[in-house]
Amino acid sequence: MQLILLEKIANLGNLGDKVNVKAGYGRNYLLPFGKATAATAANLAAFEERRAELEKAAADRKASAESRAAQLAELEVTITATAGDEGKLFGSIGTHDIADALTASGVEVAKSEVRLPNGTIRNVGEFDVAVHLHAEVEATVRVVVVAA
């Protein structure tokens, strides 16, 4: 399935690229979320007319993400959780908890932007958490988990 990308997609292409993707990925993700359009002659012409507008919108999103990344770089978030004697938490700290703590600190972060590659946090301590704000912008936040 050939599509024209309407925004930068990680590991796929940039705005305006004509890409070949599997039909399911195109129909179930890229097209419904407005990230791409079918690569027909009419859509190519319409895209070229809107190219400047789309590039400006993409630049605005990236600038916004970079400003949020600068704010996040300065933050250190402390989360309190109940823990046992050896520092093992009763439960865990997930992406939702971290996103809520960052939002409470003054920087709006969605749960889907927080990346925990090793799974949820289950121990007391300091952790560096990646926050993926844009396809080209990622920030690292120090999260301190303390026992209640």
UniProtKB/Swiss-Prot annotation:
<keyword id="KW-0689">Ribosomal protein</keyword>
<dbReference type="Pfam" id="PF03948">
    <property type="entry name" value="Ribosomal_L9_C"/>
</dbReference>
<dbReference type="Pfam" id="PF01281">
    <property type="entry name" value="Ribosomal_L9_N"/>
</dbReference>
<protein>
    <recommendedName>
        <fullName>Large ribosomal subunit protein bL9</fullName>
    </recommendedName>
</protein>
<dbReference type="InterPro" id="IPR020070">
    <property type="entry name" value="Ribosomal_bL9_N"/>
</dbReference>
<keyword id="KW-0699">rRNA-binding</keyword>
<comment type="similarity">
    <text>Belongs to the bacterial ribosomal protein bL9 family.</text>
</comment>
<dbReference type="InterPro" id="IPR009027">
    <property type="entry name" value="Ribosomal_bL9/RNase_H1_N"/>
</dbReference>
<dbReference type="GO" id="GO:1990904">
    <property type="term" value="C:ribonucleoprotein complex"/>
</dbReference>
<keyword id="KW-0694">RNA-binding</keyword>
<dbReference type="InterPro" id="IPR036791">
    <property type="entry name" value="Ribosomal_bL9_C_sf"/>
</dbReference>
<dbReference type="GO" id="GO:0003735">
    <property type="term" value="F:structural constituent of ribosome"/>
</dbReference>
<dbReference type="GO" id="GO:0005840">
    <property type="term" value="C:ribosome"/>
</dbReference>
<dbReference type="InterPro" id="IPR000244">
    <property type="entry name" value="Ribosomal_bL9"/>
</dbReference>
<dbReference type="InterPro" id="IPR036935">
    <property type="entry name" value="Ribosomal_bL9_N_sf"/>
</dbReference>
<dbReference type="GO" id="GO:0006412">
    <property type="term" value="P:translation"/>
</dbReference>
<dbReference type="InterPro" id="IPR020594">
    <property type="entry name" value="Ribosomal_bL9_bac/chp"/>
</dbReference>
<dbReference type="GO" id="GO:0019843">
    <property type="term" value="F:rRNA binding"/>
</dbReference>
<keyword id="KW-0687">Ribonucleoprotein</keyword>
<comment type="function">
    <text>Binds to the 23S rRNA.</text>
</comment>
<dbReference type="InterPro" id="IPR020069">
    <property type="entry name" value="Ribosomal_bL9_C"/>
</dbReference>
